[in-house]
């Protein structure tokens, strides 16, 4: 087993998804159903003011909020240290509504990957570059991953199966120390951007 595979197996053995993450995922599902354009803007924007406006627009979805924490959590997550995980949850929720993602073909790997949305994720650029590369070369592997329950044995197995793609796409010399939840989020967002920009003619990353 490679060092990368061993790291992911050990990191994924921590157990079930924490309750706050479950709450946030439920909120995202509800918010997307009522504010899909704003939720997409959170992922697509390349301007700070647009990002803030999009985050503010989903804090007042009253029927989605079951506590004060649920109301404020999206805004805090959109700008805090958990920004990357938050964006990944939004991406996963939007991908569930996609009619095209399963039609994406694996593409040959290219020498570099870059996109305007990297600046808003809060992740190391090398992680987003890797995720974008995997979304291009192995979209099916990410789809399998996103079909698993976060924190489950199935997720761990899906991540292990993705190890060759992750290794091939990771920048030489970069030490990947991202936890499974963060890795899942990065891959989900990268796949969302590939699917959305392929699905909407004239859009670019």
Residue positions per predicted region:
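Extended amphipathic alpha-helical interaction segments
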Residues: 86-151
């Amino acid at each position: 087993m490679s060092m990368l595979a061993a790291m992911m197996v050990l990191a994924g053995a921590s157990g079930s998804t924490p309750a706050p993450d479950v709450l946030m995922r439920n909120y995202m599902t509800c918010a997307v159903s009522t504010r899909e354009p704003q939720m997409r803007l959170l992922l697509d924007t390349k301007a700070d003011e647009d990002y803030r406006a999009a985050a503010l627009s989903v804090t007042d979805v009253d029927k989605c909020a079951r506590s004060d924490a649920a109301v404020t959590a999206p805004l805090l997550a959109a700008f805090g240290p958990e920004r990357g995980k938050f964006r990944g949850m939004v991406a996963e929720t939007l991908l569930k509504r996609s009619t095209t993602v399963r039609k994406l073909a694996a593409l040959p790997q290219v020498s570099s990957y870059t996109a305007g949305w990297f600046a808003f994720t809060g992740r190391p650029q090398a992680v987003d570059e890797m995720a974008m590369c995997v979304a291009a070369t192995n979209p099916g592997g990410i789809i399998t991953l996103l079909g698993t329950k976060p924190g489950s044995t199935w997720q761990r197995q899906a991540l292990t199966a993705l190890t060759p793609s992750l290794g091939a796409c990771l920048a030489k010399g970069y030490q990947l120390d991202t936890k499974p939840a963060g890795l899942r989020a990065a891959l989900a967002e990268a796949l969302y951007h590939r699917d959305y920009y392929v699905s909407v003619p004239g859009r670019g990353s």
